[in-house]
């Protein structure tokens, strides 16, 4: 801005009011651009009066009445709006969803700031319990870091992370469908088309983690949640291993024994192939009612995982049997999914031949089970021994030393999506429960997995877009019949629609109606 020299030869002191006006315009988004006219550059006449020839669009500077103006109270809170400070008081405790050795998981409602009124799950961890063990500290930090890094339709979203003197808080999306474990306990076993849907979504989540250099290592029904629509969400990343890429081996002993790969138990070093063993163990659990290798105690279970032959029930289809044998190979190098194709190798197997992977990733495929929910706060899909407890977050009366707190520096996090509109609206649609719940009707009458008529073996043109590597079709192993103790006899038709069903001389076994799960893996419903 030009300054006119006074008659005494000196220039007047600069006027900063214009700069302040520009700064204020930045706050209120006011357009201060002036017409490009050299004759209107704040020229002052003698006497300090404004030149009346300035163009104001036909309206004089003082001709606007109050009816044209909006009153706005200027205060520190309205002008200097910084990022919202997240603390425990921002959330109202509603229900207890679960408990562990290091803390609790609550259902909460946000009562201040962005997302006011929205329901979340709040995981509260006690610092004093965590710092006792360096491994536990590493697991906690890994979970927070992984949840910040990974965004995927089938992985739980981290919304906030913050801490107080004695506690760590993870605010996660609330998954009202509960644990897949609950559905497995209620049903006993899943039909193959139902298991196929869940395993397909899980395989996509595992593949995404592996692309990020992350091994999940703790795949089990308890860590697989369902959202309100019935889609899968992987949770609990405390046992994940970060920064593991092709060829990298880790030796950490962790995870749930029944779903643990042999190379972890032998401490011989492991890589991402352990997740495909766990997927096979989970698949076996879904289709038979128990993990493939269980014993009376921890030692016997480990012995069976390392030495015992895999027994497959005769009622399984040939595709299911073949996939289980390829996933549950003790030699990790020859295990399906261990090659460069990773998830693409698994997804190319004929067991998944009905899956449209592009639609699955977009969550356009209808899940086989949709939770019956009465409201957004519904907790009916969670264990009642927790939900009936009074939700109380114990006082934060323990503060760690400054040196001990150093390990939790940088824990605080706010998701970039917090200021965006919620992508998915909550809806409640009454739906009849699956007929699989009624004894005597073990077969699902209509497969919920969508596929193109006549396309029984191809993965579709969309498969290559969902997976970076184009998978190759792997031939099934058809030689050899697995041994299994047959306690009952009867006929059970293949639950998965197959154009040319296998007619091998297999001795049929009825679907087990009583869960064979070990006692410590059961849930009292």
Curated annotation (Swiss-Prot):
Report the EC number(s), separated by commas if there are several: 2.7.11.1
Query: Start and end of every Protein kinase domain?
Result: 91-352
> Per the record, what is the consequence of mutating residue 252 to A?
Loss of activity towards ribosomal protein S6 and reduced phosphorylation at Thr-412
Biased composition range(s): Acidic residues:
30-46
Summarizing the annotation, the consequence of altering residue 256 to A is: Loss of activity towards ribosomal protein S6 without effect on phosphorylation status
Is-annotated flag, keyword Ion transport? Answer: no
Describe the effect of residue 444 to D: No effect on sensitivity to wortmannin and rapamycin
Q: Identify the enzyme class.
A: transferase
Could you tell me one molecular function GO term of this UniProt entry? PDZ domain binding
The annotated region (Autoinhibitory domain) lies at 424-525
* Residues forming the catalytic site: 218
- Which GO biological process annotations does it have? apoptotic process; behavioral fear response; cell migration; cellular response to dexamethasone stimulus; cellular response to growth factor stimulus; cellular response to hormone stimulus; cellular response to insulin stimulus; cellular response to nutrient
Where composition is biased (Polar residues), the residues are 381-399
**Quaternary assembly:** Interacts with PPP1R9A/neurabin-1. Interacts with RPTOR. Interacts with IRS1. Interacts with EIF3B and EIF3C. Interacts with POLDIP3. Interacts with TRAF4. Interacts (via N-terminus) with IER5.
**Member of which family?**
Belongs to the protein kinase superfamily. AGC Ser/Thr protein kinase family. S6 kinase subfamily.
Read off the domain note.
The autoinhibitory domain is believed to block phosphorylation within the AGC-kinase C-terminal domain and the activation loop.
- What's this protein's name? Ribosomal protein S6 kinase beta-1
Q: What is the lineage of its organism?
A: Eukaryota, Metazoa, Chordata, Craniata, Vertebrata
């Amino acid at each position: 801005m030009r300054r006119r020299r006074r008659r005494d030869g000196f220039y007047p002191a600069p006027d900063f009011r214009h700069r302040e006006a520009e700064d204020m315009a930045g706050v209120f988004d006011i357009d201060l651009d002036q017409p490009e006219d050299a004759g209107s550059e704040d020229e002052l006449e003698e006497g300090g009066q404004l030149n009346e020839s300035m163009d104001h669009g036909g309206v004089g500077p003082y001709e606007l009445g109050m009816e044209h103006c909006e009153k706005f109270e200027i205060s520190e809170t309205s002008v200097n709006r910084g990022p919202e400070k997240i603390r425990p008081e921002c959330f109202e405790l509603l229900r207890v969803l679960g408990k562990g050795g290091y803390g609790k998981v609550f259902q909460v409602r946000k009562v201040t700031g962005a997302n006011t009124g929205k329901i979340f799950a709040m995981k509260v961890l006690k610092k004093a319990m965590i710092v006792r063990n360096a491994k536990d500290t590493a697991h906690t930090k890994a979970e927070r870091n992984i949840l910040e890094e990974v965004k995927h339709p089938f992985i739980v979203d981290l919304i906030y992370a913050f801490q107080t003197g004695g506690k760590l808080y993870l605010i996660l999306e609330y998954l009202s469908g509960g644990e897949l474990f609950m559905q497995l306990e209620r049903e006993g076993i899943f039909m193959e088309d139902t298991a196929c849907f869940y395993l397909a979504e899980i395989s996509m989540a595992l593949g995404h983690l592996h692309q990020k250099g992350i091994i999940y290592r703790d795949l089990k029904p308890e860590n697989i949640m369902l959202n309100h629509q019935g889609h899968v969400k992987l949770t609990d990343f405390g046992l994940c291993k970060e920064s593991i890429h092709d060829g990298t081996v880790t030796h950490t002993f962790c995870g749930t024994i029944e779903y643990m790969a042999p190379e972890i138990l032998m401490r011989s070093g492991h890589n991402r192939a352990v997740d495909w063993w766990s997927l096979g163990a989970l698949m076996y659990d879904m289709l038979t009612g128990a993990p493939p290798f269980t014993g009376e105690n921890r030692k016997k279970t480990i012995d069976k995982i390392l030495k015992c032959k895999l027994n497959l029930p005769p009622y399984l289809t040939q595709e299911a049997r073949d996939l289980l044998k390829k996933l549950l190979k003790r030699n990790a190098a020859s295990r399906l999914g261990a090659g460069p194709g990773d998830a693409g190798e698994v997804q190319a197997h004929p067991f998944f031949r009905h899956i449209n992977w592009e639609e699955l990733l977009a969550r356009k495929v209808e899940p086989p089970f949709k939770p019956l929910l009465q409201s957004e706060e519904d907790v009916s899909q969670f264990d009642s021994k927790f939900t009936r407890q009074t939700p109380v977050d114990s006082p934060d009366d323990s503060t760690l030393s400054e040196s001990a707190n150093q390990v939790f520096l940088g824990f605080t996090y706010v998701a970039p999506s917090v200021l965006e509109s919620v992508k998915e609206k909550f809806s409640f649609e009454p739906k009849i429960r699956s007929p699989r719940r009624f004894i005597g009707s073990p077969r699902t009458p209509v497969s919920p997995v969508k596929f193109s008529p006549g396309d029984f073996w191809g993965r579709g043109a969309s498969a290559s877009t969902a997976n970076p590597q184009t998978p190759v079709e792997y031939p099934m192993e058809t030689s050899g019949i697995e041994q299994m103790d047959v306690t009952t006899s009867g006929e059970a038709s293949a639950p998965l629609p197959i154009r040319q069903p296998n007619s091998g001389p297999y001795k049929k076994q009825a679907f087990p109606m009583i869960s064979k799960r070990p006692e410590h893996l059961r849930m009292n419903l």
